[in-house]
Amino acid sequence: MTGVQTCALPISVIALLAIAPLYGFAQEKVVPIKYGDMDQWIIRKVHESGVIGGNTKLLYEIGPTKEIDGNKPYKNMGGSPWGTSNVMAKVVGIVKTNNSVYRDKRDNGYCARLETHIESVKVLGMVNITVLAAGSIYLGDMLEPITGTKNAEKNMNWGVPFTQRPKAVRYDYKVKMSGEKDRIRLTGFSKKGQVAGQDCAITVFFLQKRMEDAEGNITAKRVGTMVMKYDKDSDGWVNGATYEVLYGDITKHPSYNHETMGLRERDYTRNSKGESVLIKEIGWAEANENPTHMILQFSSSHGGAFIGSPGNTLWVDNVKLVY
């Protein structure tokens, strides 16, 4: 393969989105993201190693209703485009889980509860790791098992193929803040540190036009952007919250925030060779360009891996795109 080509993966837009759109106002078309109603969940029963207690933990994944018993690496099922921060790790032969996304009851169905907490595993003479883990759901998948906290983000496949141009993202949410004025950093390899500034729950939506070169490196131009931070408790559920997607170069837009909306070089994807590579955003696309991929993440904390405030909680339900 020579030159530069647009990335292509065998997932169609039709498989990603629910087939029948919902119609709202006269000039508005609303399309649910597949499994975005959060009413179907896969429950994994993972048995942790005896040396750390031998407990059976339940890990929740978004997909067709099913139970899986056993320490099997998870792969997205039933055409689900959703990954979660719930993972099975195997470090120096010890099986340990992290569970920071939960299935919560809501009315006659379910929603997703994302929670920031501290996870630790300690075995004398073998392993001593304590990390801060945010609750996160996202479009993409995770390669299991995780074998350590160093470069664990390489296990994540960030985003899904997508070629449309929605005008907004819509979902229901509820927020509960930790009440802490600053965040903490716990990476598993160093002492607990303090990070200035209040923790926030966050929604990130990016549309990218990706290219892959002959060596498998992936670059991207940013086509569309929507980022929303939540720094206060909500008054119960906020239904049908709708946020506009901004197209093209948005650096002069009044709502632009470089920290959260700027071009990035920290997300990973799998190239056509199946290798995990960094996505390097190299510029802003023209405002009328079509994307090749969509990134959507909901997280109970912001600021990067292993940073946040324990207790921060974000509930999410009924995720849709508006055209």
Regions found by a protein language model. Give the residues of each.
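Short, solvent-exposed secondary-structure capping/transition elements
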Residues: 178-185, 213-215
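Hydrophobic h-region of N-terminal signal peptides that target proteins for export
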Residues: 16-25
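Substrate-binding/catalytic groove segments of enzymes
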Residues: 181, 250-258
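Extended, low-complexity, turn-rich repeat/linker tracts enriched in Gly/Pro/Ser/Thr and Asp/Glu
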Residues: 175-182, 193-198, 305
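Short, small-residue-biased leader/transition segments that mark boundaries at the very start
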Residues: 2-9
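Aromatic (Trp/Tyr/Phe) and Gly/Pro-enriched flexible surface segments
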Residues: 27-164, 196-248, 259-322
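Sec-dependent N-terminal signal peptides
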Residues: 10-16
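A short beta-strand element within beta-rich, extracytoplasmic domains
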Residues: 165-175
